[in-house]
């Protein structure tokens, strides 16, 4: 709405189990509307479960996403069978801004709302907020228990922004994309029955190594029996090398690094993941390798999305890698990959159970969601790196990040698929050599979402722009239109 009336409308695409009883899927696509105060896109509530809708807004040039959300909980004492609706979509708002480089205004509700038709109740606890294109929280309404506030308007919280400041950040985020790698996988409809997915739940122990100082500890690293242990990145090298030295120390497949990694896995009768500079002719790749208990290399992945530092010595790879093991389907990635949300989409679509990510130093950008919006006992706010946290949640898989510790911060962590209400976010303690957690894969049910439901609910008919080159005539036509679906062949 503007001073002259309606400017544009958006009809919700992401529908949850309650929504489908009342609504049909939207038919407006994700539009971006030019206004005197900036280019604005609209997203509704459960849309946040899917990374694609806010990405489509960014691809169409949005500067601001206006997001109508909720912060609902099930009522205290709700039986477990009915408690699967326990969630908090407003606790997802940071990913829209951080991954897409846009301003995000997330408005949520307050108080206890009752449905007069079926008698159900929503237990809203406030927390509306505004976020910068860098993924930083600018202002937030207090989180207030619903018993203390009636439903309705209980305050307006504001800050001053310059919408155009999003443009450079957004374009930087989008420039890291490689649409040729996503085509056609991210635009395909996945069948409800997927033979590639892990069918039988199985227990798995996950471990993320934590190293301090610059030295490598590869020679002394080994997993526990049938454990998946992920080491920090460039696992066989000191962490203070420049690009020229990293290139000089690059080695071919089957070289000293892979041999040492395989010996460590065999000695511990488990699975060991690390990364190294791999030389192949004149090219050097940042390669992640997975070794198994038999002392062999089970899979290799060449990083597809490089950080600025990696670009000074590495060539990007050209495909994601998922390895089927007795522990489940293990995907391989690097920390830099996680900044590009399409990578999460690829591994989700390939039915990854655990994503193994050798990482480096702790990131400056942490989870900034108000801890009061979480139902878990130890919220990740302020201590967990944001990108692995987001990847696990948006991809609905477990993520293990081996990393280094600097002062009070660490890149070593284990990230669960439903960190708001159900699964822990674990970071290695000071002085610990690793953090460990035993769980079940595929990620157990008990909440309102899982990987299968995530795939079933996708609107792949809207996703063609995600896999098109930005110079493609069809993409350009879709972007210029501003709203409405893509009609190109």
Language model: regions and residue ranges:
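Catalytic domains of carbohydrate-active enzymes, especially glycoside hydrolases
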Residues: 218-237
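C-terminal functional modules
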Residues: 460, 464-489
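CN hydrolase (nitrilase-like) catalytic-core segments centered on the catalytic cysteine
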Residues: 48-157, 250-273, 339-437
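Active-site catalytic loop in hydrolytic enzyme cores
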Residues: 1-91, 95, 150-153, 162, ...
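Short beta-strand segments enriched in small/hydrophobic residues
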Residues: 194-213
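Short beta-strand-to-loop element that shapes/binds the nucleotide-sugar donor at the catalytic cleft/hinge
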Residues: 274-279
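Short, acidic, Ser/Thr-enriched surface-loop or helix-capping motifs
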Residues: 1-2, 131-133, 239, 292-293, ...
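Metal-dependent catalytic neighborhoods of phosphoester/phosphodiester hydrolases
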Residues: 235-253, 281-284
